Design a protein with these regions (language model features):
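Solvent-exposed loop and beta-edge segments used for protein-protein assembly and interaction
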Residues: 67-69, 144-146, 176-181
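Short, exposed beta-strand-loop hairpins at the edges of beta-sheets
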Residues: 159-180, 185-188
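Short, flexible domain-boundary/linker segments around small modular repeats
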Residues: 43-60, 116-137, 179-188
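Feature for mature exported/ectodomain regions
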Residues: 38, 43-103
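Gram-negative bacterial Sec-dependent N-terminal signal peptides
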Residues: 1-27
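Mature extracytoplasmic domains of secretory-pathway proteins
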Residues: 83, 88-151, 155-158
């Protein structure tokens, strides 16, 4: 095998990959560089609807809500300037109409209203598994950080399920939660 040929091939391959990676020759591939730049900039900011949808999907995936029209999800969050704000929509919404750009700093509270609950009326959830699932999903989306205290409240229980992200449940993990009674989640 000719080592000069292999070396030249590697250098040429690296140059091609570097050039394509910078986007200089993306037009050669039929890509529109303006769209690529706009997409990257749009993802730097979040809308209140995108935040709301991430929270709603995490609640649904953790089996806390059904995502139907009989549920209302109100998300209170902290802005980078220190003020707080909130966004609310029914559970069957996609958040697409909520388009206010926000400078998100962190979640504060999630309030849930459930009316006319027919499905899962008596469904019981393992408190520890529910807490772990929700915090894992919210953390994976960048909405929670290690060390934050998260508590899940239920109107049929006097004590919440609480714990610290990255450490686990510290109280109430032995409880079961009746799905329809979960009404508030706080983040400190």
């Amino acid at each position: 095998m000719n080592t000069k040929f292999s070396g030249k091939t590697l250098v040429a391959s690296a140059l091609v990959l570097t050039t394509l990676g910078t986007g200089l020759h993306s037009s050669y591939l039929g890509l529109d560089t303006n769209k690529v730049v706009k997409t990257a900039k749009a993802e730097e900011k979040m809308t209140d609807g995108q935040l709301w949808k991430k929270v709603k999907d995490s609640l649904h995936d953790s089996d806390i809500i059904l995502s139907n029209e009989y549920e209302t999800i109100n998300v209170t969050y902290l802005l980078s300037n220190g003020y707080s704000s909130s966004v609310s929509a029914p559970g069957n919404d996609d958040g697409g109409h909520l388009t206010q750009s926000i400078d998100f700093k962190g979640l504060k509270q999630i309030d849930l209203t459930k009316e006319n609950v027919y499905d899962d009326f008596n469904k019981k959830l393992d408190a520890k598994n529910t807490w772990n699932s929700l915090t894992e999903k919210l953390k994976g989306l960048g909405l929670l950080q290690n060390g934050q205290k998260v508590s899940i409240y239920s109107s049929d229980s006097s004590s919440p399920v609480s714990g610290k992200v990255g450490e686990g449940v510290t109280s109430g993990g032995e409880n079961t939660l009746t799905k329809r009674f979960i009404n508030k989640i706080t983040i400190d």
